[in-house]
Amino acid sequence: PQHASRPFDKNRDGFVMGEGAGALVLESYEDAIARGARIYGELIGFGESGDANHITTPTMDGPLRAMKGAYKMAGEPKVDYVNAHGTSTPINDKNETAALKELFGGKENCPPVSSIKGQVGHCLGAAGAIEAVVCLMAMRDGVLPPTINYSTPDENCDLDYIPNQARKAEITVAMS
């Protein structure tokens, strides 16, 4: 079970159910300052989309629309890290890689990418919140989280997935 979830690995064969929760407080900067809150980050853009193609054979169109919406709303900043959905499914990981390459204008322009699903599994409804918390912690600590269980590269998933070892980096803008 420890090696069952293998995001972006050539030998991935499906997601592993996880269990977890993440919580974030979203409030105005002024309110956070007024109550003396420790501010971990700022939400500068978001996107949402549905992929109505088919539940088990999605395309990259839905995720790409969401990514483009968030990126445009944020003012198209230099992104230092992407915490990918990275479900360990052959179709999703390939489509997500293609969408990231399109968003950033090619493989050579993509920031480092990782998926935490090798560590925690797919926490379904909690996945987005957990991934946002991981982005904030990565920014706070200056550490790119690894994609664990990555051992065999896939020609369709050819980005820098931060394989197996965390990496120090300055992270100003992260995308999840």
Question: Where do the language-model regions lie?
Answer:
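Conserved beta-strand-centric core segments of catalytic alpha/beta enzyme folds
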Residues: P1-D31, A127-S176
